[in-house]
Amino acid sequence: MNIQANSCDLRSKLPLWILFFFTFYGNSVSAQQMDYYQHINRAEELFVLNHDPSCFKEFNKAFHTKARYFAKDAYIAAQIALYLKDDQKVLLYLKRAFEHGLPFTALTSAPIFQRIETNSIYPKIVQVYQSCQKPTFDAVVRDKIYDQCFKSDSLKFYMGRDSKKIAQFTQYEDSFRDYLKVEFLSKGIFPNENLIGIATDSIYEDFMRRFGHVDPYAAEEKQLFGSTNSIPTEYGLVSKYSFSVLLHSSCSFPNYQKLLYEAVLNGYMQPIEYGLLHETSVSWNQGMKNPHEGCSPLLSDAYYNILGFDPTKSTQTKIDESDTEGMKRVEKNRAAIGMQKYSIDQLKRIDQKNLGIKFFFYFLER
C-alpha cells in the first residue's frame, strides 16, 4: 500500500477552501510570532535608549498577541519594572512569567532580583506565584530527552581517545539528532522550554533518581572540588538538553535550516538560538570530526555577531564594527529571523553590567 500516494490523493480531493484555511492559518501563526519578536525587540530598544516606562506599551502588545511567548521575556519586563520602581508592573509581568513556566527558584537569576526577599514587594510576589495558573509541560518527552542526553554525556565522558568509543559516541548523537528531526522538527516544533519546561536542578535530579542514573561529570566535579557548580541550571531560563546535541554537530544547521526556522516561527526556538546554531556550525566545527556527517557549512549568511573573534579559527563569523557594509549585513540577518539589533544588544550589555538587568544573551552549555 502506497501511503504517500494515498495521502496525496486525499489532499487533492480536499475542498479548496479547506486548503486555503490551513495555508492562511499557518501564515497567520507565523506572522503573529514575528510580531511578538518585533514587539519584544522594540520594548528592549525603548528601554535602553530612554530608561523610562515607554517600553511597557510594547511589552504589553507582545504579551497580548496570540503568539507563543517565552518566560524570559516577561521576566526581563519585570526586571525593568523593578528598576523603574513600578511594583504593579513587577507583579503583572512576574505573573505572566510564572504562567509560562518561570520556576520560583529562578526568581533571583538576575542581579537586580538578588535581594528581592528583603523588598516589601516580596510577600506579594510569593502570593502571585502561589495563586497563578501553572503551565503543564510534556513530562514524558522531557524524560526521553533527558535520558538520551544523559547517555550521550556518559559516552562522551568515558570515550577518551578510544576510536571505537568515539565512533559509538558520534553514532549515538547522530541517532539523537535523527530523533529530534523525526519527532519534532519535521512537525514544526522543537522540544524547548515551551514544550518540556525550563531545565532546573530539582527536575533533573528527580529524573536521575527515578532512572537510577549517576551524572559522571557532576560526580567528578564533586570529587575534585568538593561540590558541583553553584549556579542553578534554571538561571539560564532555557531547556538546554535538546539544544546541546545540535550544537555538537557541524551539520545540524545546514541539514535542518528550514525546519529550525519553522520552529522559530512557531515559538519553539528563540531567534538568538537559531542564529547561534548557524554561527557555531561554522565557527566551532571547522574540521569534519564525525565521519558519518557530510555537509557544506552555510557561511554566506552566518553573520549575527553573537560569537566574538577567535584567533584560533581560520574562518570567522564576527564582523568588525568598523566594517560599515558588513554591519549592515549583520543587522539584516538579525532582522530576518526576528533577532534584536546588534546595536541595541550592545546597549543592553551596558545596562546588564551597570543596572543588574539580565538580558540572557548566551545559551548556557556545560
Predicted regions and their residues:
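Preference for long, solvent-exposed alpha-helical segments and helix-linker "stalks"
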Residues: 53, 63-70, 84, 88, ...
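Start-of-helix register in tetratricopeptide repeats
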Residues: 37, 71-75, 106
